[in-house]
Amino acid sequence: MLLALAQWLQGDASFLRLFTYLTFRAVMATITALGIGLVCGPWVIRKLTEMKVGQAVRKDGPQTHLVKSGTPTMGGVLILIGIAVATLLWGDLTNRFIWIVMLVTFGFGVIGWVDDYRKVVYKDPRGMSSREKYFWQSVIGLFAAVYLAFSVSEANNVRVFDLFMAWVRSGLSMGLPARADLMLPFLKSISYPLGVWGFIALTYFVIVGASNAVNLTDGLDGLVIMPVVLVGASLGVFAYVMGSAVYSKYLLFPHIPGAGELLIFCSAMGGAGLAFLWYNTHPAQVFMGDVGALALGGALGTVAVIVRQEIVLFIMGGIFVAETLSVMLQVTWFKYTKKRYGEGRRIFKMAPLHHHFELSGWKETQVVVRFWIITLMLCLFGLSTLKLR
């Protein structure tokens, strides 16, 4: 919004050229989202408390968690407000990637909000059924996947439509330009052509998978938000490189026109996340709930797809991957042993993984900070793929 205003008034005030610089707008988006979160946080927490949207705590979990019962949840709305305002103020609203990421983020946010609302207001511990939640995630994820399949390699929506029609005329058999290939880290001249169907399948898996992985990780005070901020910031760096014809050529990456604008979104997400951490750090005054976790995970997955860094997201988001695998392994092994031996057996003391470490004697803050440190190291490793190729 401010970019368009600056471009309109630029002839009358040369200093407004500052608003055309992507890095300046990224910094301002961070500050804006951070400020909104810090200022509006107490009001949002107070309103959530008045609504009696307290978090229910598992009685079979760590006993130290029982004191968390009743802490306001659905605090993810605070993050989404910060992201929305900062992105709309400082982003280029003609950029198609901004809108598709916003669609996924807020679409998944609505799913999470409905789930949270049913749990805490209607006192239904099940919330949305797994089938219902997965259905709506799939609708949004598939829509984004189909659109991105034809837009990642093209400069504007006219060319996106032309590419789509060419695919239809080919009998749905035509491939995609090389810029839509799956990039392999550390290999500068080797990529894997996915084709349209492969791209759609991978994108769907990344977006929906990332959303649910972040949601599973959200179980301790401050645990999930800092990894989201770190991974989001790292993806913002990739977006800046991919969106720049100069830097992408120098680093031997495919140039993706318009991708650089995602730095604004990632910066807004970082600022909003840090503001939320102010109130979510131990002992938490508010939890983000599904409304925040599903939305942020979907956002990370979508940005990773656009900048063609799905594998790097898997690396940098290693904590999310480990948490998800711990649940899958625990459930699978329990069902298998129950069927074979008549009693269910566990691999971990409790899943997701962070609860296993708690029950192993780690304090909550130790688990959280150590997971942050691991994520920081993984993000630095992921960023190293920019040059080590």
Curated annotation (Swiss-Prot):
The keyword Transcription regulation does not apply. Keywords: Cell cycle, Cell division, Cell inner membrane, Cell membrane, Cell shape, Cell wall biogenesis/degradation, Magnesium, Membrane, Metal-binding, Peptidoglycan synthesis, Transferase, Transmembrane, Transmembrane helix. Its EC number is 2.7.8.13. It catalyses: UDP-N-acetyl-alpha-D-muramoyl-L-alanyl-gamma-D-glutamyl-meso-2,6-diaminopimeloyl-D-alanyl-D-alanine + di-trans,octa-cis-undecaprenyl phosphate = di-trans,octa-cis-undecaprenyl diphospho-N-acetyl-alpha-D-muramoyl-L-alanyl-D-glutamyl-meso-2,6-diaminopimeloyl-D-alanyl-D-alanine + UMP. Its cofactor is Mg(2+). Pathway: Cell wall biogenesis; peptidoglycan biosynthesis. It is found in: Cell inner membrane. InterPro entries: Glycosyl_transferase_4 (IPR000715), PNAcMuramoyl-5peptid_Trfase (IPR003524), PNAcMuramoyl-5peptid_Trfase_CS (IPR018480). The chain crosses the membrane at residues 25-45, 73-93, 97-117, 135-155, 190-210, 222-242, 258-278, 286-306, 311-331, 366-386. One of its GO terms (molecular function) is metal ion binding. It is a multi-pass membrane protein. It is an enzyme of class 2 (transferase). GO terms for cellular component: plasma membrane. Belongs to the glycosyltransferase 4 family. MraY subfamily. PANTHER family: PHOSPHO-N-ACETYLMURAMOYL-PENTAPEPTIDE-TRANSFERASE, PHOSPHO-N-ACETYLMURAMOYL-PENTAPEPTIDE-TRANSFERASE HOMOLOG. HAMAP family: MraY. Catalyzes the initial step of the lipid cycle reactions in the biosynthesis of the cell wall peptidoglycan: transfers peptidoglycan precursor phospho-MurNAc-pentapeptide from UDP-MurNAc-pentapeptide onto the lipid carrier undecaprenyl phosphate, yielding undecaprenyl-pyrophosphoryl-MurNAc-pentapeptide, known as lipid I. This is Phospho-N-acetylmuramoyl-pentapeptide-transferase. It comes from Burkholderia multivorans (strain ATCC 17616 / 249). The lineage of its organism: Bacteria, Pseudomonadati, Pseudomonadota, Betaproteobacteria, Burkholderiales. The gene is mraY.
